């Protein structure tokens, strides 16, 4: 019976050490995951910022095209009123 108790004690000591090591490994994994989640958050923020600037540039380009077209149309109308050739011939619709 004494040998069985020693065997049980040995088993539980080994099991306890295994559980302690597992807890350490789990804590280390949690720390790594927390670090990775933070890194992903930074990437997400940078992506959103970049997307904003891309959208902003697209908007600015669109507004620039509209302004340029208005300027060309205004110049063409001015030149037509004064009998000069327009910058770009615009087909009448």
Curated annotation (Swiss-Prot):
This is Putative hemolysin E-like protein. It comes from the Bacteria. It holds the Pfam family HlyE. GO terms for biological process: hemolysis in another organism. SUPFAM superfamilies: Bacterial hemolysins (SSF58100). Belongs to the hemolysin E family.
């Amino acid at each position: 019976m004494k040998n069985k108790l020693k065997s049980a004690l040995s088993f539980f000591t080994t099991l306890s050490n295994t559980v302690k090591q597992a807890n350490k490994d789990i804590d280390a994994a949690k720390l790594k995951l927390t670090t990775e989640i933070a890194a992903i958050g930074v990437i997400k923020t940078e992506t959103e910022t970049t997307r904003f600037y891309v959208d902003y540039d697209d908007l600015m380009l669109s507004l620039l095209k509209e302004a340029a077209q208005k300027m060309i149309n205004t110049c063409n109308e001015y030149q037509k009123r004064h009998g000069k050739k327009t910058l770009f011939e615009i087909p009448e619709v």
